[in-house]
């Protein structure tokens, strides 16, 4: 990663649009976007948090609330998360000015959170409609005093490495499509009011053949591994990668998506650092009785996993060999 930004690069970065679509001149091109710290934190610090803020973040169960800017309408996007969740992750693993990458940006919540926190961010999505949604939300949340860049790109996640220098990304954060979890009719068994607008509907991201949300678990896991293996070199050493996933029930069996992803990303070179529980009990309404009295099943809608990985640091022996080669 470069130690400084040239004047020409700074001018170029300020001219970047908030959205890039297939066919645009910048599509498939390396983005000249700033990725360096703009804070005065010590070089060894991993974030700008105070000691008090750090202590609060050590608790391994997190709760969040939605705010007015959040999108909760599933007809707009089938799987959203609060801005406050994205802000927590970004604050914990980046400094001001650094670069955040969301490989499956969806409704653009990551971009809004990064903008609030003076971080640069780029999000990718297959669907032009979601990129348009991101752009609209960014324009509604514009801040004339914020000099960071937020960009949504219509692109397959498999092609993301074309857009960045190696080692330029400080955080990869996303809530990806959840295999074929949403690609089936809703039965609302866990809802007290089952006969609502969601009953019988398929709340899917798309039916694009490249969409991870239509894949069976084994194929989904391998495809996620292929994508994240290509993303790993974009992270600087000790740069974090956080993935929000639930598990699912299918034909009376728990499908442990989070376990599959942990094992797959470990095989691809990532190191698991933490597992955090997102406690959703404060934002879930109308839960009905489920499984009583013969089959105890935890309510999947009440919690999800935040899987925290990082790019392992380069061993000192390798650094010494590299220094000797350069001399």
Give the predicted meaning of each segment:
Residues 1-327:
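Class I S-adenosyl-L-methionine-dependent methyltransferase catalytic core
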């Amino acid at each position: 990663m470069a130690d400084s930004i040239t004047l020409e690069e700074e001018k170029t970065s300020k001219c970047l649009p908030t959205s890039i679509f297939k066919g645009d001149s910048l599509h498939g091109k390396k983005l000249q976007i700033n990725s360096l710290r703009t804070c005065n934190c010590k070089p060894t610090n991993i974030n700008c948090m105070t000691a008090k803020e750090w202590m609060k973040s050590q608790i391994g169960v997190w709760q969040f609330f939605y705010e007015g800017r959040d999108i909760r309408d599933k007809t707009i996007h089938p799987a959203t998360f609060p801005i406050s969740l994205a802000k927590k992750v970004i604050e914990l693993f980046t400094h001001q000015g650094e670069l955040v990458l969301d490989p499956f940006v969806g409704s653009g919540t990551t971009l809004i959170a990064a903008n609030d926190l003076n971080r640069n961010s780029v999000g990718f999505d297959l669907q032009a409609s979601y990129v348009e949604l991101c752009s609209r939300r960014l324009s509604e949340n514009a801040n004339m005093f914020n000099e960071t860049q937020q960009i949504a790109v219509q692109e397959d996640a498999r092609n993301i490495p074309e857009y960045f220098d190696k080692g330029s990304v400080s955080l990869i954060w996303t809530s990806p499509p959840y295999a074929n979890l949403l690609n089936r009719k809703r039965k609302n068994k866990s809802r007290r009011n089952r006969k609502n607008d969601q009953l019988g509907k398929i709340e899917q991201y798309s039916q694009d053949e490249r969409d991870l949300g239509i894949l069976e678990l084994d194929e989904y896991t391998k495809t996620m591994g292929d994508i994240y293996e290509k993303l790993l070199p974009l992270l600087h050493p000790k740069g974090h990668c956080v993935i929000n996933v639930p598990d699912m029930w299918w034909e009376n069996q728990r499908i442990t998506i989070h376990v599959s992803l942990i094992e797959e990303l470990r095989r691809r070179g990532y190191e698991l650092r933490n597992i955090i529980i997102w406690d959703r009990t404060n934002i879930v309404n109308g839960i009905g009785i489920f499984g009583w009295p013969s089959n105890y099943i935890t309510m999947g809608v009440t919690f999800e996993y935040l899987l925290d990985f990082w790019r392992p640091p380069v061993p000192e022996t390798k650094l010494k060999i590299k220094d000797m080669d350069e001399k």
